[in-house]
Design a protein with these regions (language model features):
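A conserved helix-loop-beta module that forms one wall/lid of the active-site cleft
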Residues: 92-151
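Short acidic-hydrophobic, aromatic-tinged amphipathic segments that line or gate anion-handling sites
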Residues: 44-50, 121-125, 156
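Internal nucleotide-binding/catalytic subdomain
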Residues: 153-293
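Generic C-terminus detector
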Residues: 368-372, 376-426
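ATP-binding N-terminal substructure of ATP-dependent carboxylate-amine bond-forming enzymes
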Residues: 1-95
Length: 426
């Protein structure tokens, strides 16, 4: 079986690693991939980035399954193109991908189907948006509606900050066309939870929960990033919270998918907020999270390829996904200066100490390139250092111990991944 994985980050490395465990997989192609092809057997990078080029490659190579990691191509309609050519692909079609591609569309969907979410209004007219600010209490959340690499959300502390943010997004175009439409919504103060799930449009099966750490600095301060680390499962995802999530968010989401005839097999990532004991949906992502995937997949006991095939065959109702009774901690090692300005091309030492097939400790490649059997930095988020242990405290301890074994110029990581959260009883 030949599998094509679309994307270039640590998420795609984790997917490739998990898929490669299935004996049916003879060859993995990564488009465009990164240096992880050097540590996964029978894996080859192909330097293709557009949906048309990737489609032509899949046709010529007779690819059996394509898995799309990156959101941009999903919103661009890569799944629809593959399906028109009778190619098997895992991911949402263009319509369903709009649940991530347009926050305004997603919020309207939530409202229509009774998904519990924060109060909001969407705007394409800046003056009307500014006027609406007078009705809000602060802080307030302002979101660029389109894709902004996880960085298009601003929490404005006061009226002036909110108006400045609207000017940045709608006039100065700091997020380009993504900010043509903005969503202004009430601020919810609480704990965030990430729940990845898989759907065949008939059922949705949640994965174990996770906790991302979005800000660049300790104690969730500083600039937004794509994510600086993850723990899984999330200590705050209690049985009570899970029941509220299923009743008020998952079930109405599935109802909407069915009624809107969004017929697809893929991932739904629920970005949740617990506030005052209630669970709210902040956003949908229609693909695996990064870096959530790097912490969640190592805890999956079931064969991931078999799970994906069950979704493609609309047979999820007949399977159960098994999970390790363990905890994971993923620490992101970034280039100094990320997420603003940073160097590339710095030599990475210490990677030889880690085996991707080690069940307890892994290093997934994100912004990494290989030259002459040596590895160099090639992005802002460079490495994902993951440890799987019997409890969260041990997973955090070992992950940071492993971080110290790796070095590159001006490397940076948050020192508090997982430590802000302590287990609580239901």
């Amino acid at each position: 079986m030949k599998v094509l994985i679309v994307g270039s980050g640590g998420r795609e490395h984790a997917i490739a690693w998990k898929i490669s465990q299935n004996p049916k997989v003879e060859k993995i192609f990564a488009a465009p991939g990164n240096a992880y092809n050097k540590v996964i057997k029978n894996c080859e990078n192909i330097n293709l980035k557009t949906s048309d080029d990737i489609l032509n490659f899949a046709l010529n190579e007779k690819i059996d399954l394509t898995i799309v990691g990156s959101e941009e191509l999903l919103v661009d309609g890569i799944v629809d193109k593959f399906q028109k050519n009778n190619l098997t692909i895992f991911g949402p079609n263009k319509e369903a991908a709009m649940l991530e591609g347009s926050k305004a569309f997603a919020k309207d969907f939530m409202q229509k189907y009774g998904v519990k979410t924060a109060k909001y209004q969407s705007f394409t007219d800046k003056e009307k948006a500014i006027k609406y600010l007078d009705e809000m209490s602060y802080p307030v959340v302002i979101k660029a509606s389109g894709l902004a690499a996880g960085k298009g959300v601003v929490i404005a502390q006061n009226r002036k900050e909110a108006e400045d943010t609207l000017n940045d997004m709608m006039t100065n175009k700091v997020f380009a066309a993504a900010g043509d439409t903005v969503v202004i919504e009430e601020f919810l103060d609480g704990v965030e939870i990430s729940v990845l799930s898989i759907t065949d449009s008939e059922v949705i099966i949640p994965f174990i929960s996770a906790k991302d750490h979005k800000k660049i600095s300790e104690k969730e301060t500083g600039l937004n990033t794509g994510g600086m680390g993850v723990i899984a499962p999330n200590p705050y995802y209690t049985k009570t919270i899970e029941e509220k999530f299923i009743q008020n968010i998952l079930n109405p989401t599935l109802k909407g998918i069915k009624e809107e005839k969004m017929n697809f097999a893929g991932i739904i990532f629920f970005g949740l907020m617990i506030a005052n004991g209630e669970v709210y949906l902040l956003e949908y992502n229609m693909r695996m999270g990064d870096p959530e995937t790097q912490a969640v997949l190592p805890l999956m006991k079931s064969d991931f390829l078999d799970v994906i095939n069950s979704a493609l065959n609309k047979d999820l109702k007949n399977i159960k996904i098994d999970w390790e009774n363990k905890s994971a901690c993923c620490v992101v090692m970034a280039a100094g200066g990320y997420p603003v300005k940073y160097e590339k091309g710095n030599f990475i030492s210490g990677l030889e100490k880690f085996d991707i097939n080690n069940s307890d400790n892994k290093v997934f490649f994100a912004g990494v390139k290989e030259e002459n059997d040596k590895f160099y930095t090639n992005g802002g988020r460079v490495l994902n250092v993951v440890s799987i242990q019997d409890n969260l405290e041990k997973a955090i301890e070992v992950a940071y111990k492993n971080v110290k074994e790796i070095s590159f110029k001006d490397n940076y990581c948050r020192k508090d991944i997982g430590t802000l959260y302590v287990p609580i009883k239901d």
